[in-house]
Amino acid sequence: LLDHQDYVKSQWGYYYMVGSNGALMTGVVSWQGSLYYFDPSSYLLKTSGSVVSGNSAYSVASDGKLTLLTGNQAFLMIIKQAAIDGWKKYGVLPSVTAAQAILESGWGKSTLATEAYNLFGIKGSYNGQSVTMLTAEYGSSGYYYIYDQFRKYPSYYQSIEDHGYFLASNSRYSNLLWNRNYSTVTYLLHEDGYATDPNYASSLNSVITANGLTSWDYEAFNS
């Protein structure tokens, strides 16, 4: 066994990363000042395309080196699988989940998203973890601000998974589960009291169409 982490080439020409305990490493691995990604199933070095790991997205060069991606497309890459899994597990439409995350977190740039990985503004605590922040509410006299407690998550994936659970476990949202029409789902979200903003449904619809998010729905339906 090796007594240190090393990058090795097999007799068949495949590259692997071996840990100091002799076990093959997977996921994002740092080696000689660069990041690489080793597939969790095959253990092989990825040498093309892009990859998502945790709360980060990367482009992959032909030599396997990773470059961190930023911006809106990177955010979509990071949340896509969790949104699709939310349909499979809870019946929450992926396009709507993504639009809510985009709208409510400002593409993951809100203070709540960056400090607590909370993409949906869900209040309360998650496994005992929470943060207190200033939030805008809408009432009969318009918008006003209050301090409230919000759930704190270890990652975006848990935030999206909890969003699906939140909707599925609250009976008032049962009418939107497993519905395949995004405009119906966004309408019901507002009618059921998810948000107080009178333009909430139309704002979600605009985000969905602008970013082609219905393609995620079809991918979920066919997977």
Where are these regions (language model features)?
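Catalytic cores of secreted/periplasmic lytic hydrolases that degrade extracellular macromolecules
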Residues: 68-223
